[in-house]
A protein has these predicted regions:
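Outer-membrane beta-barrel channel domains
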Residues: 1-215
């Protein structure tokens, strides 16, 4: 069960995943920039910006969207499969989960595919595809590319994501994008960092966690 917490921020609660099925090798499904921590309720780590009230990190894939209601109560899962592994420079993760109907939520299928490839000496590039289909209630599809490059004391990262949700309650069919780029240079006497992020007002990721829109 989730610990009760008081939310004093304007961002929604972000509770950690505790189910073993989703925890095993869950790092393969991490997308975007390396986690910097978050000041969100449910996390004890500081936010990337260092400000206590900064938004938590976006999670393109957040497994708590599967088999759990918004209140945290369980929704039955009829069946599911999950495969993770490595082959040479590639890390691959795939899952397919069928969630049972539980009024007012229709029976829903969740699919996730993540491929990441090591490049150069200490860098990686990757892609992720997500698909959620609810019987009679349309679909939500998400596709993204990401890269993290490291050259000694300099590290750079970027990602871009597009969503499509024809029956979304958001205007424009939930079709929008998010993108982020950052750099970090750290030496013994110098620390320089910067970041730029755009999150579209209609960006709609039903299998992830997005703390805010229209950034």
């Amino acid at each position: 069960a989730d610990e009760q917490q008081v939310n004093l921020t304007r961002f929604s609660l972000l509770f950690p995943e505790k189910r073993e099925f989703f925890l095993e090798n869950s790092g393969i499904f991490q997308f975007g920039l390396p986690s910097t921590g978050s000041s969100a309720v449910g996390s004890a780590r500081p936010a990337a910006s260092g400000r206590q009230n900064s938004p938590p990190d976006m999670k393109l894939f957040f497994s708590r969207q599967i088999g759990l209601s918004k209140s945290g109560s369980a929704i039955p899962i009829q069946f599911g499969s999950r495969v993770t592994g490595r082959a040479g420079p590639y890390a691959i993760g795939a899952l397919n989960i069928q969630q049972a109907e539980q009024d007012p939520v229709a029976a829903t299928n969740f699919t996730a595919l993540r491929v990441d490839r090591s490049v150069l000496a200490n860098s990686d590039i990757g892609m992720m595809l997500l698909n959620k289909e609810a019987g009679g209630q349309g679909y939500n599809r998400v596709g993204g590319l990401d890269a993290n490059l490291r050259f000694g004391q300099l590290s750079m990262g970027a990602y871009g994501v597009k969503t499509a949700a024809p029956q979304s309650i958001l205007p424009g069919s939930g079709e929008d994008f998010t993108a982020r780029a950052n750099f970090n240079y750290a030496s013994r006497n110098v620390l320089v960092r910067g970041a730029y992020e755009v999150i579209g007002q209609r960006f709609h990721d039903e299998m992830g966690y997005v703390p805010r829109l229209g950034v």
